[in-house]
A protein has these predicted regions:
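Hydrophobic anchor at the start of a short beta-strand
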Residues: 2, 52-53, 78-79, 159, ...
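Conserved phosphate-binding/catalytic loop of the ribokinase/pfkB sugar-kinase fold
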Residues: 83, 93-126
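Conserved phosphate/ATP/ADP-binding segment of small-molecule kinases
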Residues: 142, 146-230
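Short beta-strands and strand-loop turn motifs
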Residues: 101-103, 128-134, 162, 180-185
Length: 301
Protein backbone atom coordinates (compact mmCIF):
# COMPACT_ATOMS: atom_id res chain seq x y z
CA UNK A 1 0.00 0.00 0.00
CA UNK A 2 1.08 3.56 -0.72
CA UNK A 3 0.53 6.16 2.01
CA UNK A 4 0.89 9.92 1.65
CA UNK A 5 1.24 12.50 4.42
CA UNK A 6 0.06 16.09 4.05
CA UNK A 7 0.49 18.09 7.25
CA UNK A 8 -1.45 21.14 6.09
CA UNK A 9 -4.09 20.25 3.45
CA UNK A 10 -6.01 23.08 1.84
CA UNK A 11 -8.88 24.07 -0.34
CA UNK A 12 -7.29 25.59 -3.42
CA UNK A 13 -9.42 28.33 -4.98
CA UNK A 14 -8.11 28.57 -8.52
CA UNK A 15 -8.83 31.71 -10.55
CA UNK A 16 -7.87 32.55 -14.12
CA UNK A 17 -7.90 36.14 -15.36
CA UNK A 18 -6.83 37.85 -18.55
CA UNK A 19 -4.87 40.30 -16.41
CA UNK A 20 -4.63 41.07 -12.70
CA UNK A 21 -4.94 44.78 -11.91
CA UNK A 22 -4.09 45.75 -8.34
CA UNK A 23 -6.56 48.08 -6.64
CA UNK A 24 -9.27 47.34 -9.22
CA UNK A 25 -12.24 44.97 -9.50
CA UNK A 26 -11.02 41.93 -11.42
CA UNK A 27 -13.36 39.44 -13.07
CA UNK A 28 -12.30 35.86 -13.64
CA UNK A 29 -12.68 33.81 -16.80
CA UNK A 30 -12.33 30.45 -15.00
CA UNK A 31 -12.63 29.26 -11.42
CA UNK A 32 -12.42 25.95 -9.59
CA UNK A 33 -12.07 24.62 -6.06
CA UNK A 34 -9.87 21.58 -5.49
CA UNK A 35 -8.29 19.81 -2.53
CA UNK A 36 -4.69 20.94 -2.20
CA UNK A 37 -1.44 19.83 -0.64
CA UNK A 38 1.48 17.92 -2.07
CA UNK A 39 0.60 14.56 -0.56
CA UNK A 40 -3.04 14.87 -1.66
CA UNK A 41 -1.87 15.68 -5.19
CA UNK A 42 0.24 12.52 -5.21
CA UNK A 43 -2.75 10.45 -4.09
CA UNK A 44 -5.10 11.99 -6.66
CA UNK A 45 -2.70 11.42 -9.54
CA UNK A 46 -2.08 7.85 -8.39
CA UNK A 47 -5.84 7.33 -8.53
CA UNK A 48 -5.97 8.78 -12.05
CA UNK A 49 -3.27 6.28 -13.02
CA UNK A 50 -5.16 3.35 -11.50
CA UNK A 51 -3.32 2.99 -8.17
CA UNK A 52 -4.80 3.11 -4.68
CA UNK A 53 -3.29 5.00 -1.77
CA UNK A 54 -4.27 6.18 1.69
CA UNK A 55 -3.84 9.86 2.56
CA UNK A 56 -2.90 10.88 6.09
CA UNK A 57 -2.78 14.37 7.53
CA UNK A 58 -4.67 16.92 9.60
CA UNK A 59 -7.97 18.70 8.79
CA UNK A 60 -10.13 21.07 10.82
CA UNK A 61 -13.45 22.88 10.66
CA UNK A 62 -15.88 23.26 7.76
CA UNK A 63 -13.04 23.76 5.31
CA UNK A 64 -11.47 20.51 6.52
CA UNK A 65 -14.74 18.70 5.87
CA UNK A 66 -14.79 20.22 2.39
CA UNK A 67 -11.20 19.09 1.76
CA UNK A 68 -12.13 15.53 2.74
CA UNK A 69 -15.34 15.53 0.69
CA UNK A 70 -13.65 16.93 -2.41
CA UNK A 71 -10.71 14.56 -2.06
CA UNK A 72 -12.95 11.51 -1.69
CA UNK A 73 -15.01 12.61 -4.70
CA UNK A 74 -11.97 11.69 -6.80
CA UNK A 75 -12.25 8.13 -5.48
CA UNK A 76 -9.35 8.57 -3.07
CA UNK A 77 -9.13 7.21 0.47
CA UNK A 78 -8.65 9.69 3.32
CA UNK A 79 -7.59 8.79 6.84
CA UNK A 80 -7.18 12.25 8.33
CA UNK A 81 -6.81 13.31 11.94
CA UNK A 82 -9.72 15.69 12.62
CA UNK A 83 -8.79 18.63 14.83
CA UNK A 84 -11.27 20.03 17.33
CA UNK A 85 -10.40 23.67 16.76
CA UNK A 86 -9.50 25.95 13.88
CA UNK A 87 -10.07 25.36 10.19
CA UNK A 88 -8.08 24.02 7.28
CA UNK A 89 -6.54 26.73 5.15
CA UNK A 90 -7.79 28.18 1.88
CA UNK A 91 -5.14 28.91 -0.74
CA UNK A 92 -5.89 31.31 -3.58
CA UNK A 93 -4.14 30.55 -6.88
CA UNK A 94 -4.38 33.43 -9.34
CA UNK A 95 -3.41 32.66 -12.91
CA UNK A 96 -3.00 35.71 -15.10
CA UNK A 97 0.07 36.79 -17.08
CA UNK A 98 1.98 35.64 -14.01
CA UNK A 99 0.96 33.15 -11.33
CA UNK A 100 0.25 34.58 -7.89
CA UNK A 101 -0.47 32.51 -4.80
CA UNK A 102 -1.91 33.53 -1.44
CA UNK A 103 -1.62 30.65 1.01
CA UNK A 104 -3.48 30.42 4.31
CA UNK A 105 -1.78 29.51 7.58
CA UNK A 106 -3.76 26.46 8.69
CA UNK A 107 -4.86 25.25 12.13
CA UNK A 108 -2.93 24.70 15.34
CA UNK A 109 -1.95 21.03 15.59
CA UNK A 110 -1.80 19.96 19.26
CA UNK A 111 0.48 17.24 20.56
CA UNK A 112 -2.44 14.82 21.02
CA UNK A 113 -3.24 15.07 17.30
CA UNK A 114 0.40 14.45 16.44
CA UNK A 115 0.31 11.28 18.52
CA UNK A 116 -2.81 10.18 16.64
CA UNK A 117 -0.95 10.55 13.35
CA UNK A 118 1.86 8.36 14.67
CA UNK A 119 -0.73 5.77 15.69
CA UNK A 120 -2.00 5.69 12.11
CA UNK A 121 1.57 5.24 10.87
CA UNK A 122 1.69 2.03 12.91
CA UNK A 123 -0.46 0.44 10.19
CA UNK A 124 2.39 0.57 7.68
CA UNK A 125 3.97 -2.80 6.94
CA UNK A 126 7.06 -4.21 5.27
CA UNK A 127 6.93 -3.35 1.56
CA UNK A 128 4.64 -0.32 1.94
CA UNK A 129 5.58 3.10 0.58
CA UNK A 130 5.26 6.41 2.44
CA UNK A 131 5.39 9.78 0.68
CA UNK A 132 6.37 12.73 2.87
CA UNK A 133 5.83 15.89 0.84
CA UNK A 134 5.78 19.59 1.42
CA UNK A 135 6.75 22.11 4.05
CA UNK A 136 6.22 21.79 7.78
CA UNK A 137 3.67 24.26 9.21
CA UNK A 138 4.92 26.34 12.12
CA UNK A 139 2.41 24.60 14.40
CA UNK A 140 4.42 21.35 14.16
CA UNK A 141 7.93 20.56 15.42
CA UNK A 142 10.48 21.33 12.73
CA UNK A 143 11.93 17.82 13.11
CA UNK A 144 8.65 16.02 12.40
CA UNK A 145 10.02 14.42 9.20
CA UNK A 146 12.98 13.07 11.12
CA UNK A 147 10.76 11.78 13.93
CA UNK A 148 8.53 9.93 11.48
CA UNK A 149 11.46 8.35 9.66
CA UNK A 150 13.14 7.36 12.90
CA UNK A 151 9.85 5.88 14.12
CA UNK A 152 9.56 3.72 10.98
CA UNK A 153 13.24 2.77 10.69
CA UNK A 154 14.03 -0.89 10.14
CA UNK A 155 10.51 -1.86 9.10
CA UNK A 156 11.13 -2.27 5.36
CA UNK A 157 9.10 0.79 4.38
CA UNK A 158 10.11 2.75 1.28
CA UNK A 159 10.06 6.44 2.17
CA UNK A 160 9.96 9.19 -0.43
CA UNK A 161 10.78 12.73 0.66
CA UNK A 162 9.85 15.66 -1.57
CA UNK A 163 10.71 18.77 0.41
CA UNK A 164 12.94 21.81 0.52
CA UNK A 165 16.71 21.56 0.73
CA UNK A 166 16.91 22.05 4.50
CA UNK A 167 14.45 19.26 5.21
CA UNK A 168 16.12 16.95 2.69
CA UNK A 169 19.54 17.37 4.25
CA UNK A 170 18.17 16.56 7.70
CA UNK A 171 16.54 13.25 6.66
CA UNK A 172 19.42 11.80 4.63
CA UNK A 173 20.81 9.96 7.67
CA UNK A 174 17.60 7.90 7.76
CA UNK A 175 18.18 6.53 4.25
CA UNK A 176 15.16 7.75 2.26
CA UNK A 177 14.34 5.46 -0.66
CA UNK A 178 13.84 8.43 -3.01
CA UNK A 179 14.41 12.17 -2.81
CA UNK A 180 13.43 14.67 -5.51
CA UNK A 181 15.34 17.95 -5.45
CA UNK A 182 15.30 20.20 -8.48
CA UNK A 183 18.58 21.26 -10.05
CA UNK A 184 18.64 24.60 -8.23
CA UNK A 185 17.93 23.02 -4.83
CA UNK A 186 20.66 20.47 -5.42
CA UNK A 187 23.16 23.25 -6.02
CA UNK A 188 21.98 25.17 -2.97
CA UNK A 189 22.56 22.10 -0.79
CA UNK A 190 26.24 22.33 -1.63
CA UNK A 191 26.50 26.10 -1.90
CA UNK A 192 27.30 26.20 -5.61
CA UNK A 193 25.70 26.58 -9.02
CA UNK A 194 25.57 23.28 -10.90
CA UNK A 195 25.51 23.90 -14.64
CA UNK A 196 26.19 20.57 -16.33
CA UNK A 197 24.68 17.11 -16.28
CA UNK A 198 27.97 15.73 -14.99
CA UNK A 199 27.99 18.17 -12.07
CA UNK A 200 24.40 17.34 -11.17
CA UNK A 201 25.00 13.60 -11.19
CA UNK A 202 28.22 13.98 -9.20
CA UNK A 203 26.37 15.86 -6.47
CA UNK A 204 23.47 13.40 -6.58
CA UNK A 205 26.11 10.78 -5.84
CA UNK A 206 27.21 12.83 -2.84
CA UNK A 207 23.62 12.76 -1.54
CA UNK A 208 23.71 8.99 -1.86
CA UNK A 209 26.92 8.91 0.15
CA UNK A 210 25.05 10.91 2.80
CA UNK A 211 22.26 8.34 2.93
CA UNK A 212 19.80 8.74 0.05
CA UNK A 213 19.11 5.59 -1.95
CA UNK A 214 17.81 7.06 -5.23
CA UNK A 215 17.92 10.67 -6.43
CA UNK A 216 15.47 12.12 -8.95
CA UNK A 217 16.44 15.58 -10.22
CA UNK A 218 13.82 17.71 -11.95
CA UNK A 219 15.12 20.44 -14.26
CA UNK A 220 11.92 22.14 -15.47
CA UNK A 221 12.22 22.82 -19.20
CA UNK A 222 15.52 20.94 -19.39
CA UNK A 223 13.96 17.60 -18.41
CA UNK A 224 15.15 15.36 -15.60
CA UNK A 225 17.97 13.14 -14.38
CA UNK A 226 17.84 10.03 -12.21
CA UNK A 227 20.58 8.24 -10.30
CA UNK A 228 19.69 4.82 -8.89
CA UNK A 229 21.10 3.08 -5.84
CA UNK A 230 22.81 0.64 -8.24
CA UNK A 231 24.70 3.51 -9.90
CA UNK A 232 22.63 3.59 -13.10
CA UNK A 233 21.75 7.00 -14.46
CA UNK A 234 18.93 8.05 -16.77
CA UNK A 235 18.22 11.29 -18.58
CA UNK A 236 15.07 12.57 -20.24
CA UNK A 237 14.35 15.75 -22.16
CA UNK A 238 11.25 17.69 -21.18
CA UNK A 239 8.23 16.66 -23.26
CA UNK A 240 7.00 19.32 -25.65
CA UNK A 241 3.89 21.21 -24.64
CA UNK A 242 2.49 24.50 -23.40
CA UNK A 243 2.76 25.27 -19.70
CA UNK A 244 -0.74 25.78 -18.34
CA UNK A 245 -0.43 24.99 -14.66
CA UNK A 246 2.74 24.56 -12.62
CA UNK A 247 0.88 23.62 -9.41
CA UNK A 248 1.12 19.90 -8.75
CA UNK A 249 3.60 19.06 -11.50
CA UNK A 250 6.30 17.92 -9.08
CA UNK A 251 3.81 15.89 -7.06
CA UNK A 252 2.59 14.31 -10.28
CA UNK A 253 6.15 13.32 -11.11
CA UNK A 254 6.37 11.44 -7.81
CA UNK A 255 3.04 9.72 -8.45
CA UNK A 256 4.03 8.74 -11.98
CA UNK A 257 7.35 7.39 -10.75
CA UNK A 258 5.60 5.19 -8.19
CA UNK A 259 3.00 4.00 -10.69
CA UNK A 260 5.68 3.10 -13.22
CA UNK A 261 7.74 1.30 -10.59
CA UNK A 262 4.76 -0.75 -9.41
CA UNK A 263 3.48 -1.60 -12.89
CA UNK A 264 6.87 -2.72 -14.20
CA UNK A 265 7.79 -4.87 -11.23
CA UNK A 266 10.54 -2.49 -10.18
CA UNK A 267 12.01 -1.12 -13.43
CA UNK A 268 13.90 2.10 -12.72
CA UNK A 269 13.75 3.10 -16.37
CA UNK A 270 9.97 2.72 -16.58
CA UNK A 271 9.51 4.51 -13.26
CA UNK A 272 11.67 7.42 -14.35
CA UNK A 273 10.10 8.02 -17.74
CA UNK A 274 6.57 7.62 -16.41
CA UNK A 275 7.43 10.15 -13.71
CA UNK A 276 8.65 12.64 -16.32
CA UNK A 277 5.56 12.12 -18.49
CA UNK A 278 3.15 12.44 -15.57
CA UNK A 279 4.72 15.63 -14.26
CA UNK A 280 4.56 17.18 -17.71
CA UNK A 281 0.98 16.02 -18.29
CA UNK A 282 -0.13 17.94 -15.20
CA UNK A 283 1.87 21.00 -16.25
CA UNK A 284 0.17 21.00 -19.65
CA UNK A 285 -3.37 20.76 -18.23
CA UNK A 286 -5.76 22.78 -16.05
CA UNK A 287 -6.13 19.67 -13.91
CA UNK A 288 -3.92 16.86 -12.63
CA UNK A 289 -2.60 14.31 -15.12
CA UNK A 290 -4.83 11.55 -16.46
CA UNK A 291 -3.77 8.17 -17.79
CA UNK A 292 -4.43 8.98 -21.49
CA UNK A 293 -2.43 12.22 -21.22
CA UNK A 294 0.49 10.40 -19.64
CA UNK A 295 0.49 7.60 -22.21
CA UNK A 296 0.45 10.12 -25.06
CA UNK A 297 3.57 11.85 -23.72
CA UNK A 298 5.31 8.57 -22.94
CA UNK A 299 5.19 7.61 -26.61
CA UNK A 300 7.42 10.59 -27.41
CA UNK A 301 10.07 10.01 -24.74
Amino acid sequence: MIYTVTFNPSLDYILRLDALEKGEINRVTYENILPGGKGLNVSMVLKNLGHESRALGFVAGFTGEAVKKQFESFGCTADFVHLAEGFSRINVKIKAKEETEINGQGPLIPEAAQKELFQKLENLQDGDTLVLAGSIPNTLPDDIYERIMEHLAGRGIRIIVDATKGLLLKVLKYGPWLIKPNNHELGEMFGKELKTEEELLAHAKKLQEMGAKNVLISMAGDGALFLTEAGESFKSPAPRGTLVNSVGAGDSMVAGFLAGFEESGGSWQRAFFMGVATGSASAFSENLATRPEVEALLRNL
